[in-house]
């Protein structure tokens, strides 16, 4: 039962990484930039949810919606103030700005909520499930996380392929200048992309802290890095790739902790990424990019 339990835990953790990675892959796929402050938006969403449930005593559903609203507005604000002026700047300028935004959010959280860890309450509306006379426990958080991941991936896929705004996003992703000539508002499209990615980060933050109920200002840092790794692993810019990469990364991490070493699990995860990129630089489901000369 240990193997099955580890597999379930890996899929659950990987589903969180997948939801975060979807935010990365959407922003990169459409705006062609990497938002390394994405992990800290996760932290903000978790803190908002914590305040709603702990201080206002409102239901978890209200807390999740509030976290999504705040993070959506935060994502639009970050894009407008930090990234929009750098649209034509080099990638190094964007990277430095993203790191600066990340540290800014962490320090603001430190000023508001302090450095003491906060205990996060579970958002699950039902109890864990015990199977085989209690030998296998499937937590309610795991079930909710996996279901949420599947729903989000399907919804995003349908949105990008069927909706008018989704088609506009794909057009901007292919060629910004051509999309603008066709009447698409590129600025609004990119802002909407950041908004969606930040809303997903809020959901991921709540799910992550519900499963691992300790909340500090740096909560989103490592999950953010691992989710970026998952996005690259699966093929950054690909929605199914983000989900596949996240789940595989979660499984590798949990099995590494269980069968090899807890202290080496992160190193193993990143080593696997390096091997995959050496064999397939675009990731598992990434498309090969060709340039015409």
Predicted feature descriptions by range:
Residues 24, 57-101, 108, 244-249, ...:
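Alpha-helical transmembrane segments within multi-pass membrane transporters and channels
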Residues 1-20, 48, 59-63, 89-93, ...:
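Membrane-interfacial amphipathic/re-entrant helices at transmembrane-helix boundaries
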Residues 46-51, 67-74, 101-109, 148-157, ...:
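Hydrophobic core segments of alpha-helical transmembrane domains in multi-pass membrane transport
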Residues 86-162, 189, 255, 260, ...:
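Transmembrane helix-bundle core of multi-pass membrane transporters
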Residues 8, 30-77, 81, 86, ...:
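Membrane-embedded helix boundary and interhelical linker motif in transport proteins
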Residues 15, 24-46, 60, 88-93, ...:
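Short, non-helical or kinked segments that cap or interrupt transmembrane helices
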Residues 13, 135-215, 239-244:
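Helix-loop-helix "hairpin" substructures at the membrane interface of multi-pass membrane proteins
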Residues 57-69, 194-201, 207, 211-271:
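Transmembrane alpha-helical segments in multi-pass inner-membrane proteins
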């Amino acid at each position: 039962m240990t193997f099955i339990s580890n597999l379930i835990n890996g899929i659950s953790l990987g589903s969180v990484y997948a939801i975060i990675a979807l935010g990365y892959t959407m922003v990169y796929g459409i705006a062609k930039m990497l938002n390394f402050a994405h992990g800290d938006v996760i932290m903000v969403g978790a803190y908002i949810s914590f305040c709603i449930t702990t201080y206002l005593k409102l239901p978890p559903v209200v807390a999740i919606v509030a976290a999504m609203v705040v993070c959506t507005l935060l994502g639009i604000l970050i894009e407008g103030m930090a990234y929009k002026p750098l649209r034509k700047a080099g990638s190094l300028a964007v990277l430095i700005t993203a790191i600066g935004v990340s540290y800014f959010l962490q320090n603001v959280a430190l000023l508001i909520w302090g450095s003491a860890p906060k205990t996060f309450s579970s958002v699950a509306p039902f109890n864990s499930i015990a199977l085989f006379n209690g030998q296998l426990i499937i937590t309610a958080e795991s079930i909710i996380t996996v279901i949420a991941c599947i729903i989000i991936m399907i919804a995003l896929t349908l949105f990008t392929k069927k909706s008018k705004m989704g088609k506009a996003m794909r057009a901007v992703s292919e060629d910004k200048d051509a999309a603008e000539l066709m009447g698409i508002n590129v600025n609004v499209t990119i802002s909407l992309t950041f908004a969606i990615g930040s809303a997903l980060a809020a959901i991921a933050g709540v799910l992550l802290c519900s499963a691992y109920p300790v909340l500090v200002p740096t909560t989103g840092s490592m999950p953010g890095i691992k989710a970026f790794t998952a996005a690259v692993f699966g093929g950054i810019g690909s929605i199914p790739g983000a989900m596949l990469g996240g789940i595989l990364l979660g499984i590798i991490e949990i099995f590494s902790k269980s069968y090899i070493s807890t202290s080496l699990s992160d190193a193993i995860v990143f080593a696997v990424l390096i091997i995959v990129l050496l064999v397939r630089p675009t990731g598992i489901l990434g498309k090969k990019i060709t340039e015409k000369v």
